[in-house]
Amino acid sequence: MAVTKEQKASIVKKFGASEKDTGDVKVQIALLTEKINQLTNHCKDHPKDAGSRRGLISMVGHRRSLLKYYRRTDIEGYRTILKELNLRK
């Protein structure tokens, strides 16, 4: 259910400036999107798992605030990451 080290490393490599650039907004959004996708599948299989659903809603809210910040600071990068992650806005 959690993002493995290999998945995290590949996401950081794809979206970050370097392999250790985990603090960049793009990387944080991409990692949250991966976690959200995995938790969404988990919640579909286990509909009564309220704790996971609560965590999912929290992650979606955090990603939304990061996307708002990114839209304010770099509109072109924002549009690019929406296309790459297949997010709708």
Swiss-Prot record:
Coiled coil: none annotated. GO terms for molecular function: rRNA binding; structural constituent of ribosome. GO terms for biological process: translation. Pfam families: Ribosomal_S15. GO terms for cellular component: cytosolic small ribosomal subunit. InterPro entries: Ribosomal_uS15 (IPR000589), Ribosomal_uS15_bac-type (IPR005290), uS15_NS1_RNA-bd_sf (IPR009068). Keywords: Ribonucleoprotein, Ribosomal protein, RNA-binding, rRNA-binding. Part of the 30S ribosomal subunit. Forms a bridge to the 50S subunit in the 70S ribosome, contacting the 23S rRNA. Belongs to the universal ribosomal protein uS15 family. One of the primary rRNA binding proteins, it binds directly to 16S rRNA where it helps nucleate assembly of the platform of the 30S subunit by binding and bridging several RNA helices of the 16S rRNA. This is Small ribosomal subunit protein uS15. The lineage of its organism: Bacteria, Pseudomonadati, Spirochaetota, Spirochaetia, Spirochaetales.
